[in-house]
């Protein structure tokens, strides 16, 4: 990714015309389903070298702190929104505006205020404005093969300036492991390791090393640019280990390649960037970003190639190249400070001694908390803890020792907890708490740490027998093979019936004050009013739909009549399909669909019927695609009569584009494949 690039005359960051993304039938998801949105790859059929995908940091060799551990306390904003002055997470001011854009993201890249988001322990809602990076990807991206730079990443949507784009996630490493990996690299290897350096206290710098080479996310595909459109900001949420969040430094248009300055700067070049050979003899890798201000070489951090005792962090005014992927070196020469050093700088007695000193100086708990966190880093002191000790001092007790307590332990062994849960996934958290003799909240907290979440069993249409599973497997595998040898998806005509309820409202929970009474909701009647619709469509679009009259049911004669009407419309819409290729009907095995009058009509019209296994609505495009979107459209709507329901359905079908129908048909391939992968069982 870093090693190869090509000069070009197109605007910096824009793909060439021949690199314009197409719409392949099957889209590879580089993110393996672990992001909010799939991340495609281009050109069709190509894929990056395999790596283990993770949307968040994972602990790597030599790391001081596990990035998945929760180390920050939460705010207590329950009835009021999180605001500076009242929310402990916003002690440095607001981070985002009403549009979820980073505030004060100046064109000079001078954004230096610490960013702390509300975390899992905060009592504010999930809709809090201070929760942005933790929500993951909000735009569609595509990994694509560049002309000579290897793989890159581009957006398929417009991204406003200041919006969060993605993280640079990977293994969090110790400095010795970073040096070991870098010294093992050859000239042809790409370097993905990034070092973030943050000023902490008294000239000390806190460093975070991240390597997505083997375990990472889409951030590993970002290429360097001397005029980048992204800016990297360390954002802390649950842990002292920052998330390396990339924000749009300007408005980014669709199909524009995403890039950032590997040195961590933004349009803030230093001198001596044109030095080709470094002091220790290593050749700089050339930069071909195509920017007007291109420095000709990729950024480089010589400190990572030196022994630990000789490695110093350079001043911003020193003539020394910066790291390939590091934050700007704008701090004085200073001692290397790791996260673990930061945590261990003060033990309990030392920090309690500071509490006592501040108390005797007459300072308040809030002021004491601010002073300590400003001096030793965020999260060192908690205001409620300081208040507890101040109350103790007020009583004349100035002992700094812990009082003996007979309560339950606040920690559990995660391996033991995992073994209990995996042995019986149906066990409750309270049963686990009783078995381990800990509080219920302790079990919940540790379950989150080991990545366990509670999920209900998923409803399935039927409890399949082995014969039915085998039939699903055989049909799906045969259709995959047939389509591979002779594509036929564009010949498929599919249909199904659905009841549309007059009342589509659902009872839902509400956030209310404790003494406030909930709203009333009428109990559903046993036989609600409804109307049945039959819809026929293909990849080219809608063909025909009709509604049953009240009291009317679908019979084989009625269904044969529907086929006749559909065929007449199909001849007007897709005459070539009817006369030359021949349509292929895909429907389920309902009794009217397989009755003799229906089979005679299909034989008369020359329709082929595609094999379909019983109890398989997950393999019918009308069920998994059209009706799914129709249900979302109807949610919350209420109709007074059949005409209102018919008008709503007509509004739904008229709002869909041709691509909507093609997408539903094209999903058949992936669904057949999932069925094969699950040996005929239902799949998620």
From Swiss-Prot:
CDD domains: SET_SETMAR. Zn(2+) 1 binds at residues 75, 77, 82, 87. One of its GO terms (molecular function) is single-stranded DNA endodeoxyribonuclease activity. Its main location: nucleus. Residues 1-345 are annotated as: Histone-lysine N-methyltransferase. It catalyses: L-lysyl(36)-[histone H3] + 2 S-adenosyl-L-methionine = N(6),N(6)-dimethyl-L-lysyl(36)-[histone H3] + 2 S-adenosyl-L-homocysteine + 2 H(+). Its EC number is 2.1.1.357, 3.1.-.-. This is Histone-lysine N-methyltransferase SETMAR. It comes from Homo sapiens.
